[in-house]
Amino acid sequence: MSVAEIFERVDKNKDGKISWDEFAEAIRAFSPSITSEEIDNMFREIDVDGDNQIDVAEYASCLMLGGEGNKEDEDIVMKEAFDLYDIDGDGKISASEIHVVLKRLGEKQTIAECIAMVRAVDADGDGFVSFEEFKTMMSCNNKKLQ
């Protein structure tokens, strides 16, 4: 099952984000005796931007952090997350693709803000986020969590 498929199963109301209640329901399915406090701690750790919802990028980052997986597993999860943003499948993410995905997730970033996001990680200056640049960006996010 892919990252996107798992995310969609947990996202019961299909709004593109996982609420605390959706998260708690999924966690309790695997660990019925877990306390609400433990769920809160896990949720806060995954919810990097602090908006009280887990988006697909935060979820993918969590999977990479939490597992005992190897580099190959990490690359597979990373590629699936990248593909969610690479709408046209051309192997690179544009500012407009980021804008579309974020809009679907209920975010309100402007196209100008999305262009700034791309520029922040665009190491080769081509105006797009390559898979390698995406991996670097996600690795930086993971280090902030640890």
UniProtKB/Swiss-Prot annotation:
PROSITE patterns: EF_HAND_1, EF_HAND_2. Ca(2+) 4 binds at D122, D124, D126, E133. InterPro entries: EF-hand-dom_pair (IPR011992), EF_Hand_1_Ca_BS (IPR018247), EF_hand_dom (IPR002048), EF_hand_pair_protein_CML-like (IPR039647). Keywords: Calcium, Metal-binding, Repeat. Residues 1-33, 34-69, 73-108, 109-144 form the EF-hand domain. Gene3D superfamilies: EF-hand. Ca(2+) 2 binds at D47, D49, D51, Q53, E58. Ca(2+) 3 binds at D86, D88, D90, K92, E97. The keyword Endoplasmic reticulum does not apply. GO terms for molecular function: calcium ion binding. The keyword DNA damage does not apply. Ca(2+) 1 binds at D11, N13, D15, K17, E22. Potential calcium sensor. This is Probable calcium-binding protein CML32. It comes from Arabidopsis thaliana (Mouse-ear cress).
